[in-house]
Structure formats: structure tokens, C-alpha cells
Amino acid sequence: MRIRALLALVVCMLACAGCTKKKSTDELVQDLKAKDDKSRLIAVRLLPQHKGDAAKAVPALIEALKDTESDVRISAAVGLGYFGDEAKDAIPALQAAQKDHDARVREAAGVALTRIDPARFPARSKGRPSGRK
């Protein structure tokens, strides 16, 4: 019985050996084209971890701002913010995302703009409406 349990454990460990493999930027960009929402969401959330590959990740995240799923669009905006000034090409797309029908996308886009270019897009105070003292 112990041998069976040990054998089952070894089989499980071997099966999961590839589970923790970190995907490349190219693989994640490809996953953004998947038909299922979950794959796209995972990819868009992992892309910001590839900061050294901004040239590939940023255009893919810009494209993800047009996804049909709002969670993917939110994560794309957040991810672009993580790239900071390396994501300046995303500014027009993020400004367009500020008109999204989902308020969470609009807010994420605003935060991303502030992180990308704080001089041009200063953070707004949540405590008071803009334009009032």
C-alpha cells in the first residue's frame, strides 16, 4: 500500500513538473488571442512580469484594452501602468479606455495614465471632485 501511495505521489509530481514553467512573453502574447476568457485573463495578468520585454508586451496589452471581457480590459490597463514610461505608446488607447462602459476599466485606465506620465496626468484626489476647492 505504501508503494502505491509513493508511486501515485511520484506520478503527480512528474505531471505537475511543467505546471510552474514560466511562459515566455511570446507565449503570453499568443495566449491573448485564445478563444477562452480564462486564458486571456491569465496572460494579461502575467505579461507585466516581463518588464524587460516591453517592446512585445506593451503592444499586446494595448490590443487587450479592446477585449470583449471587462476583466481582461481592466488587467490590461493595470499592466500598462506597471510598465510606466515604457508604455507611453499606450496613452491614446488608455485615453479611449477612459470612455469604456465599465467604470472599473475607466478607473484602471486613469491610474495607468498617471503611472505612465504623472506630469501630464496627475493623480486625482478621491476626496473631492475635480475643479472644486
Predicted regions and their residues:
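Immediate post-signal-peptide N-terminus of mature secreted/exported proteins
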Residues: 25-36, 45
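Short inter-helical turns and helix N-cap capping residues of alpha-solenoid HEAT/ARM repeat scaffolds
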Residues: 35-36, 68-69, 101-102
